[in-house]
Amino acid sequence: MDTKPGDAEAKPGKTEDSDFKVTPWEVTGKVDYDKLIKRFGTQRISSAIKRDMEKIADGKLHVMLRRDIFFSHRDLDLVLKDYRDGKGFFLYTGRGPSLGMHIGHLAPFVFTKWLQDVFGVNLYIEITDDEKFMRNSDYTIEQVGEAARQNILDIVAVGFDPDKTFIFKDSEYIKNIYPLVTKIAKKINFSQVRSTFGFDPSTNIGMIFYPAIQIVPTMFENKRCLIPAAIDQDPYWRLQRDLAESLGYYKAAEIHSKFLPPLSGIEGKMSSSTADSAVYLTDPPEIVENKIMKYAFSGGQSTVEEQRRLGANVDVDVPFQWLYYLFDDDDSEVERIRSEYSSGKMLTGEVKKVLAEKLNGFLGEHRRRREKSPEMLDKFMYSGELAKRMWRRIYE
């Protein structure tokens, strides 16, 4: 097993600053990602790592890597070494079910699919229905169950390999993992979860116990686990990295993304609770266009004359940032828009229309694939090659 410096020194998961706050449940303010790397004790993805991944991917690096959307990591270099040495690795990610998935929820799954396609590895997707129920006092068990089903249909539509992907709900699979959950829970004390997650006397005991459940999938195989996720999820894996080797497993490796900003501005991250700041996977084309034209924060000037003269600030312009984040993978086209918009040659309305067209194309393709998701659901959860093996296993 490998021990990397810096794990013990990493700051608590509740990261606050005078300008921004990042926890697994809340992101506010304009995030300084350089400062967050230092606070969390992670590493920036180097050009050398990108070159390695580009070589493995036959020169086709994913847009979210090329543009530093996935920007930080823990032990990604060791994952790549294991892959080159023939040891392999596996992928693990998850979803806390909500009553409506938006594009910010889907983006990490799109990147995860690329990883599975390039490396040909198994993927485990945990649906944390138990955690969602315990954390949200206004959710019933029935609501969480329906949200989980709908979210799984959206995840299936991303196009993962059904024989190398296992999607499971905690509430169903708990009997297969509970022996290992208890071993993990025994190694974590209340002081650790309180300092990591900011729990207080009002926190229910389910939430205090839950981190032990979320750690288990990192131990599904006797290989290194790579977790693609937004950087706000890092605190869970610091706990895992503290205890994994004592149980005979590898420390989890991670690759972290930046947040897709809400329509309202570049501060914080998109939230399902604010309808006008998010674009949902179910939004029809006219609603998508209306949201972008009406609500997307612009870095352009207030009049056409000023825009022609001064240009836009693309660093705070949400339509441009969304194009850059994922929704236009043509680097030369994005740079053309950056140049013409920032110089005043392009107007705000023109950039918004480009985004609306790109985003509606993305969502239209997703909806077409989702129509076939119900017939694939059983294979991902129960009858696919990996799923069948997983239901036969008990983790002790």
Features from the language model and the residues they span:
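N-terminal catalytic cores of NTP/NDP-binding nucleotidyl/phosphoryl-transfer enzymes
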Residues: 59-132, 227-229
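Short connector loops at secondary-structure junctions
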Residues: 126-139, 260-263
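Non-catalytic terminal extensions that flank enzyme cores
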Residues: 1-95, 165, 241-293, 299-302, ...
